[in-house]
Amino acid sequence: SEVGTGYHQTVYSNQNSDWGSQKELIEFINRMHAANTKVVADIVINHAGGKSWCEFFPQNFGEYGTFEPDASWIAQSDEVNSNPEAGDCKGKATGPEDGGYNMQDNYASARDWAHAKPEVQEMMKAYLKWMKNVIGFDGWRYDYAQGFKGKYIDMYNSASENYFSVVEFWNGDMNNIKSYLNDVNWNTLAFDFSTKYSAIQGIADGDYTKCKGSGLLGAGLSKFAVTFVDSHDTYFGCQGGRDNNDEIGGCGKSMEDYNKDRVLGANAFILSMPGVPCVFYPHWAKYKDAIGKMVLARKAAGVHSESQVSDEAGNGFYKATITGHHGSVRLLLGPNSGFNNIPQGYKLAYKGGNFAMYYTSTQAEVPVLSI
């Protein structure tokens, strides 16, 4: 991004930002790679920024191509064509649409790219190839994926040959997420908002029955699920003036000490279950010791994205055994789960005020957590 943090992108081929220079970014990625760590970029390709509705910038991706976008690259249903503040730009967005634009909600704060236009497709493919092969990123977190058709995610991933991608398709209905994944030809993972709004909310409310069969995990699609407790959007939802109150424990309250068991119990859930768990950094920063022990237990047991789960739930409890490559994890959530009783043959990973995570492992060497 030319300025700021990169959400309202103007020059995709300029990775200087408020966080540092492009040179510093490349150096950082190289250090992460030296530590055997993959690096994922937050990709904003739904919409374009600018100081005016008509402002566009050339995009220079070196060997991958140069591009000169203009208003004809913006979807014709974009608000630029109807907004009275658009001035001379009004009516100039003529980009083709194919039913992908505005699938769920128009992004009103910026102009939306017409991904049905071949020139836009070529620019985005060049951008991702450049980000991977020149800047050094390994994968993508696609922002606001509901703004364009899933087939373009498949197109862009196939072109860039990235190691990993996850889409932010913000929808609490598992069937809608599944439908989007099908549109992507199953060539990505998705943030599992359906598990966030069922199991994670159930843990916060003390309704542990919602943990059983929740979201993509319960639908047998854990391989495609990136599970999470909170994100920058849910955590800052009401603080940022948004109308959601999705933060675990209530808006602005998850980091309060009285919500510790809610936060850690929910993290124990995602770190025990199949799928690809994503720990929210503020949770990690505050509870590093506890969450670190859970991560090590998962690694020791060899729990993976397609691990099998045997579970039961009822009034005040959720009990699950998750089978890994090297052992298993036993998760006991809720006051009636018997969490204080160590299962035979298991070791304690971490115990809170109303939950515990235990594990077994056949590994000779104990996994080491390096952050």
Predicted feature locations:
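Acidic/aromatic-lined carbohydrate-recognition and catalytic surfaces
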Residues: 1-107, 113, 146-167, 172
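Short, flexible loop segments at the rims of nucleotide/cofactor-binding pockets, characterized by
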Residues: 15-18, 117-119, 255-257
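Alpha-helical scaffold elements lining the catalytic groove of polysaccharide deacetylases
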Residues: 112-127
